[in-house]
Curated annotation (Swiss-Prot):
Coiled-coil ranges (or none): none
Highest classification ranks of the organism: Bacteria, Bacillati, Bacillota, Tissierellia, Tissierellales
A single GO molecular function term of this UniProt record: exodeoxyribonuclease VII activity
HAMAP family the UniProt entry points to: Exonuc_7_S
Alphabetical list of Pfam families matching this protein: Exonuc_VII_S (PF02609)
Catalytic activity line of the entry: Exonucleolytic cleavage in either 5'- to 3'- or 3'- to 5'-direction to yield nucleoside 5'-phosphates
Subunit structure: Heterooligomer composed of large and small subunits.
EC number(s) reported in the record: 3.1.11.6
Predominant cellular place of this UniProt entry's protein: cytoplasm
Disulfide bonds: none
Entry protein name: Exodeoxyribonuclease 7 small subunit
Amino acid sequence: MNEYREYDEGLKRLSEIVEKLEDRELSLEENIKLYEEGMKLHKRLSSILKEQEGKMTLIKDNKEEDFQINMLLSDDNE
C-alpha cells in the first residue's frame, strides 16, 4: 500500500478509535483493545511521518546544494 494512502487511512482509523474511547460506553476490555490498536497505529503513523521528513530534508538539501552550485557557476561566467 502506498504510504500516503496508508497514512490517510491510519489517521482516519485513529480518529475513529479516539471517538470510541471518548464515548465511555465500552467495557474495560474493549477500551484496552482499542487503546492498544491506537498506540500501534500512532507508532506506525509517526514512523511514516519521520520517513517523509527525511525525504523532504534530502530534497531540500539537494536543492540548496544545486542552488549554490548554480550561483558559483553563474559567478564564474560573469
